Regions:
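Short, mixed-charge, low-aromatic patches
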Residues: 1-10, 30-37, 65-73, 112-119, ...
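N-terminal secretory targeting modules
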Residues: 1-28, 33-39, 51-60, 84-86, ...
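Conserved SGNH/GDSL esterase-like catalytic core that processes O-acyl groups on lipids
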Residues: 14, 22-27, 32-114
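Alpha-helical cap/lid subdomain in secreted, periplasmic
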Residues: 76-220
């Protein structure tokens, strides 16, 4: 599964292991996973991260199973399809619709844990991107933003703990990313809810180190 990148003379020290067969990279989750709000398909998270992987020397076979409006309960079906086609690395972006639909954190976290467990048992590396801070969304009335942000953080924490219990890794957005989106309207699309192409670029930059690290471990 690995090769040893060397210099032109073939005798330099190995830098990083890379995949020699295509890395089966699957993106699962909701509208953020699907790329709603981006101007072009090439600007979606999956496409951007696949390019990062290829630039690092990993051949990639990308499949996107994200569905707008999906909640954690929908991961069961998405995971089933992904496993049927084969998956080495899975990126799960989920939680915003659970929050909007008032799904209890314990319920959504359990559904996420079940999904991650199935993928890990099948030999996949799994990276979970927890629920975003919905308090920064313009359509949330000002007086409620602090409350919504607190609920978002509570939900994301439950997801984080569930993903780790199941053997997955977690790529949290953190307050810095939320602050960046809150300060720059250009990072949102016209609906003022989903990221724009520029917003997806910012998110992909934050996720890339996690994805590349997972690929290196798979190739080792």
């Amino acid at each position: 599964m690995t090769s040893s990148p060397t210099g032109n003379n073939g005798d330099l020290a190995t830098l990083y292991p890379v995949m020699t067969s295509p890395l089966r990279f699957c993106v699962l989750g909701d509208s953020l996973a699907a790329g709603v709000g981006s101007s072009r398909e090439d600007d979606t998270l999956g496409r951007r991260l696949a390019r990062r992987l290829r630039d690092a020397g990993h051949p990639v076979h990308l499949r996107n199973f994200g569905v707008p409006g999906a909640r954690s309960a929908d991961l069961e079906r998405q995971v089933g399809v992904a496993l049927g086609e084969g998956v080495d690395l899975a990126l799960i972006v989920i939680g915003a619709n659970d929050l909007a639909g008032f799904v209890a954190p314990a319920v959504g976290a359990r559904q996420l844990q079940d999904a991650v467990t199935r993928l890990v048992r099948a030999g996949a590396r799994v990276i979970v991107v927890p629920a975003p801070d919905l308090g920064i969304v313009a359509r949330v009335p000002g007086p409620y933003r602090q409350l919504v942000s607190a609920a978002s953080g509570h939900y994301a924490q439950a997801q984080t703990e569930a993903a780790i219990r199941a053997g997955g890794a977690v790529a949290t957005a953190g307050p810095e990313l939320a602050a960046r989106f809150a300060a720059d309207p250009a990072l949102f699309s016209a609906d003022r809810f989903h990221p724009s192409s520029a917003g997806y670029a910012v998110i992909a930059d934050g996720l890339a180190p996690h994805v590349l690290d997972a690929a290196r471990h798979l190739a080792a």
